[in-house]
């Protein structure tokens, strides 16, 4: 069996409201699970996964969150966990897949009012897509992966139905808290 490595990202915008971290979270339309922004890297993005994270952040927020510069911390983890459908596909292709996840925590200053405005814009964009679907017009499928967006504390996020990978590899991972609390932040400026 051939071994294959694929690269994915988790983009986790965080803002501190009243000294408590609030995370931008979305709910996956298909599986009804809450998660951080996630997606696969294109071949040209593998060597610079922050570009992938920023692209996914824009796509999965329906174009509402488009970040070009700021501060971040990051870490990586690997997993061979795959869905039953993916495992069946891997078996047919004769590959054993390892996924390398690049986790980026983006530190942002977003007031409570701005958070509400971002969610409102997301809902407006969602309504526009629903109208286009109803009228049988083309839509950007990448902008239609998530049906809800929220800024949540971890306490609130942990009460929701979450994707197992987020729980096991992020929320329960000490590397996440090290990155979140690190003052050794890197800057980025993508044009």
Language-model segments: what does each one mean?
Residues 32-33, 37-39, 43, 82-98, ...:
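Functional cleft and adjacent loop/helix regions within the main domain
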Residues 7-11, 49, 147:
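Residue-level detector of short, conserved catalytic/binding motifs and their immediate flanks
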Residues 20-66:
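Conserved Nudix-box catalytic region and its N-terminal flanking loop in Nudix hydrolases
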Residues 4-6, 18, 36, 96-100, ...:
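A generic fold-level signal
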């Amino acid at each position: 069996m051939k071994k294959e490595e694929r690269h994915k990202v988790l983009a986790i915008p965080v803002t501190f409201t009243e000294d408590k971290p609030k995370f931008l979270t979305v709910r996956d339309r298909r599986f009804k699970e809450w998660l951080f922004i996630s997606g696969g890297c294109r071949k040209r993005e593998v060597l610079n996964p922050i570009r992938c994270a920023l692209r996914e952040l824009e796509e999965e927020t329906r174009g509402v969150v488009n970040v070009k510069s700021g501060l971040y911390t990051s870490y990586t983890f690997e997993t061979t966990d795959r869905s039953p459908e993916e495992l069946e596909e891997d078996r047919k292709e004769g590959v054993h897949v390892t996924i390398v996840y690049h986790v980026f925590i983006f530190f942002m200053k977003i007031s409570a009012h701005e958070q509400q405005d971002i969610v409102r814009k997301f809902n407006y964009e969602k309504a526009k897509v629903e109208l286009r679907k109803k009228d049988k017009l083309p839509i950007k499928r990448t902008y239609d992966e998530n049906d809800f967006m929220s800024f949540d504390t971890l306490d609130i996020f942990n009460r929701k139905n979450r994707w197992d990978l987020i729980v096991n590899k992020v929320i329960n991972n000490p590397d996440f808290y090290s990155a979140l609390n690190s003052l050794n932040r890197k800057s980025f400026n993508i044009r």
